[in-house]
């Protein structure tokens, strides 16, 4: 049992037994399929539970981590201290006029589907991003010349004082893979995107096209966290890595993808250390060859 068992009992006062676990392996919750256990993992089913959990964590000085769909996360082999709050059960999506509103845990593919079903265009870029809308707002996720900054209208967040506030597009300060949510440690609980009216057939065609492009170019057959590195200004990370002769480079069960050099993948049986060692070698080699620093797009968290 871990050091947070007394805190676990406090949380148990407002969680059902199936919504709170101890020493939950993070490899079961993230796309990379690596990582040690979370001391406590909770899956809230309403906003009140989220607020109560955050208040307790802050009152007792217990660290916490917000988890969406786990698609852009690398958890170290030592696991995560404190509490992981997983939003997968907060996934309601509603549509009103040209706006789609989704709870933080709603998957981007499902928001994209809701937009399609209501003949709304502009969210097609997100159809293949394997994340939640909360995570997408957090990092201003994007693909294929689209990003959340292009469509976001507003978001409801929990601030550092556990107060719920509404932030406009401008107040969210969305930049390249960044936001005020990321900078200030806010927690997204709901987001609204504003789209344009379109024709079902043309929207569906674009979704199908982007899906085919993604499947043909990305190593979806292996666990990964998507694009491992941010795009350096004036360059493409994948090309720098490929031109450094690193395609297929591996350590343990982790490797640079043969299909797309911008992806570090879990070929099978990788540890988080394997992945981190591959990332470090890629960064060092690209720096030596091109004097360009590659920064990770994947979030690296946890204990060594």
Swiss-Prot record:
Please name the source species.
Clostridium perfringens (strain 13 / Type A)
User: Which SUPFAM superfamilies would you find in this protein's record?
Assistant: FAD-binding/transporter-associated domain-like, Uridine diphospho-N-Acetylenolpyruvylglucosamine reductase, MurB, C-terminal domain
Annotated pathway, please?
Cell wall biogenesis; peptidoglycan biosynthesis
- Active site per the UniProt annotation: 177, 227, 297
Reactions the enzyme catalyzes: UDP-N-acetyl-alpha-D-muramate + NADP(+) = UDP-N-acetyl-3-O-(1-carboxyvinyl)-alpha-D-glucosamine + NADPH + H(+)
**UniProt function note:** Cell wall formation.
What domain of life does the UniProt record list for this protein's source? Bacteria
Q: Would the keyword Cell membrane be found if you checked this record's keyword annotation?
A: no
Enzyme Commission identifier(s) = 1.3.1.98
Q: By what name is this protein known?
A: UDP-N-acetylenolpyruvoylglucosamine reductase
Q: Where in the cell is it found?
A: Cytoplasm
The record's InterPro entries line, in alphabetical order, gives:
FAD-bd_PCMH, FAD-bd_PCMH-like_sf, FAD-bd_PCMH_sub1, FAD-bd_PCMH_sub2, MurB, MurB_C, MurB_C_sf, Oxid_FAD_bind_N
Which keywords appear in this protein's UniProt record, sorted alphabetically? Cell cycle, Cell division, Cell shape, Cell wall biogenesis/degradation, Cytoplasm, FAD, Flavoprotein, NADP, Oxidoreductase, Peptidoglycan synthesis
Molecular functions per Gene Ontology: FAD binding; UDP-N-acetylmuramate dehydrogenase activity
Q: Which cellular component, as a GO term, is one annotated location?
A: cytosol
Cofactor(s) of this protein: FAD
Family per UniProt? Belongs to the MurB family.
Record domain FAD-binding PCMH-type: where: 33-198
| Source organism phylogeny | Bacteria, Bacillati, Bacillota, Clostridia, Eubacteriales
Biological process GO annotation list? cell division; cell wall organization; peptidoglycan biosynthetic process; regulation of cell shape
């Amino acid at each position: 049992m871990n050091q947070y068992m007394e805190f676990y009992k406090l949380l148990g006062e407002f969680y059902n037994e199936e919504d709170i676990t101890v020493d939950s392996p993070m490899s079961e919750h993230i796309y990379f399929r690596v990582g040690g256990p979370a001391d406590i993992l909770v899956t809230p089913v309403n906003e009140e539970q989220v607020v109560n959990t955050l208040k307790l964590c802050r009152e007792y000085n217990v660290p916490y981590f917000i988890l969406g769909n786990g698609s852009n996360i690398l958890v170290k082999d030592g696991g995560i201290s404190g509490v992981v709050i997983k939003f997968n059960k907060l996934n309601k999506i509603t549509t009103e006029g040209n706006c789609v509103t989704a709870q933080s845990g709603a998957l981007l593919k499902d928001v994209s589907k809701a937009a399609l079903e209501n003949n709304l265009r502009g969210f097609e870029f997100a159809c293949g991003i394997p994340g939640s809308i909360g995570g997408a707002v957090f990092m201003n996720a994007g693909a294929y010349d689209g990003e959340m900054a292009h469509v976001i209208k507003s978001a409801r967040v929990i601030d550092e004082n556990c107060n719920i506030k509404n932030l406009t597009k401008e107040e969210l300060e969305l930049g390249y893979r960044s936001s005020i949510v990321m900078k200030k440690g806010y927690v997204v609980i709901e987001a609204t995107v504003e789209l344009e009216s379109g024709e079902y057939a043309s929207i569906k065609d674009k979704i199908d096209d982007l899906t085919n492009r993604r499947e043909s170019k990305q190593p979806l057959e292996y666990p990964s966290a998507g694009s491992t590195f941010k795009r350096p200004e004036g360059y493409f990370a994948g090309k720098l890595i490929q031109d450094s002769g690193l395609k297929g480079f591996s350590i343990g069960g982790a490797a640079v993808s043969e299909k797309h050099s911008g992806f570090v993948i879990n070929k099978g049986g990788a540890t988080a250390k394997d992945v981190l060692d591959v990332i470090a070698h890629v960064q060092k080699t690209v720096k030596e060859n091109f004097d360009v620093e590659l920064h990770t797009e994947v979030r690296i968290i946890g204990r060594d």
